[in-house]
Amino acid sequence: VTVRIGAEEEFHVVDVESGRLVPRAGTLLDGLGEPGFGRELQQTAVESNSRVHDTLEGLFADLSATRRRLDAAAARLGLAVVAAGTVPLASVTSRAVTADTRFRRMADDYRRVADEQLICSAQIHVDVPDRDSAVRAMCLVSPWLPPLLALTASSPFWLGADTGYASWRTMLWQRWPTAGPAGCYGSAADYDAAMAELIDSGVISDTGMLYHDVRPSAHQCTLELRICDACPRTETVVLVAGLFRALVRDALGRLERGAEPGCDGHHEWLRAAAWRAARSGIEGRLVDPATRRGAPAPVVLRGMLRRLRPALEASGDFTAVRTLLDEALAAGSAARRLRRAAREENLLAVTDLLAAETRGERLAPRAAHRRRRPARAPGAGRAARAHVHSASAPGTPG
């Protein structure tokens, strides 16, 4: 049985000259004039929605073509689009919220949390037979989501400083009241009742604000992965899509066979596991879901690959996913590449590298870092030329 997949990607909008985040998403979308793109809470980001695909190859081609269209439209405006959890050169303001009634209400309700929503993620949708299956599968896949976050970690910088984290986006995201691990529910009715209670509490206003790491889609018969940073390289999105499809296929198979759930419903450790993944990405240790103990990231991820091999083979994905995982572990995380660019050049070089990878370029370590700006007025672009301030531990954002 074919289990179809799709992806949503969010992109930062940056000024090519300064490398800074700019609130020009509306202008970019107006210039595109195409379906499949949308606005986000902040005017500094746009979203794309893929078509539904049977194969990872089809998903890769779709995402790559979408990125090329976005890049071309942005270039005509002196802009670039960047797929990453954060961009290094940004300023927090309350004036960049998208002109939309719902978004304005969110900005009023959540204030600084909404103002600092200068982050982007990638979301993966996997087909499920029905909503009950989606809800029951959530419990089984949840322990394996932090390793997927580690693979996508691409946000070490925040407001011009190195946070010490591989995914600072995760730290920002977890401040929303419903962000974090999903609970375990016996049926869609149980889940829907619990979510209705959250809405009735007044803390959130609608189902669109259910920001758990994984959730059943409100509009499609899919299970949606939401824990990941946006990924500079399309290959990373495809790798995660392949692994998540296998997780869902494996969970559905176990439910159909009446196998004992692989999750006891106690998810307290999962928040700690997500923190560990956000802190060090694939360069450090992760919490191994099989043992709930720390282990080197490559060990955890290769163990995950072995565990999911039958499900990967059922989708025809095993060889591709194994190759992509080997390449990801050899290349290191996006966070590692970005820190190297900052160390060798500056934060503008980081933005240049992100934009190049987003459009599909795979450059030698310093090839994206050679751009020099013409002389400008005193003080202009100072932040763009400044070298990064390093921090081995997180500071207070903003």
Q: Which ranges hold each PLM region?
A:
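C-terminal accessory/tail domains of diverse enzymes
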Residues: V1-L77, M106, W173-H389, P394-G398
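An acidic- and aromatic-residue-enriched active-site/binding cleft used to recognize and process polar
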Residues: V16, L79, A84-L89, A122, ...
